[in-house]
């Protein structure tokens, strides 16, 4: 019982929604938990929003979007799964990014080098780019299913820490 009480308090679940209704409470949750699973798809709600709703009184989903996309104090990366992490912790992810990059070097990055250079050049020249902004290319075998080369390579560059998501 003592361990259960400790864990519930440690994870900011007791008392329910006790954190004040302000954007800083989102950062407090991330500081305590380290990361939040991020799933931009909505069935019952976005996963990170549901997690924050349980902890922050009067939580508004716009707070997380602003911290992530406008203020850039949060960052979208992989931490076992797609997660939101504080931007201040990015240096700790370099090891994972380097490993991901090594996995794509000699693979997708080399096999599709002209397209990688084209995408990076366009981003340098014009700024953020969506896979829908580029003429579709043939599909390649990707993690779960065949995927358009453009989308796959942009995803691989994000996994390798070369690119970041500007906005979903």
Language-model-derived ranges and their functions:
Residues 1-168:
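Long, low-complexity intrinsically disordered regions
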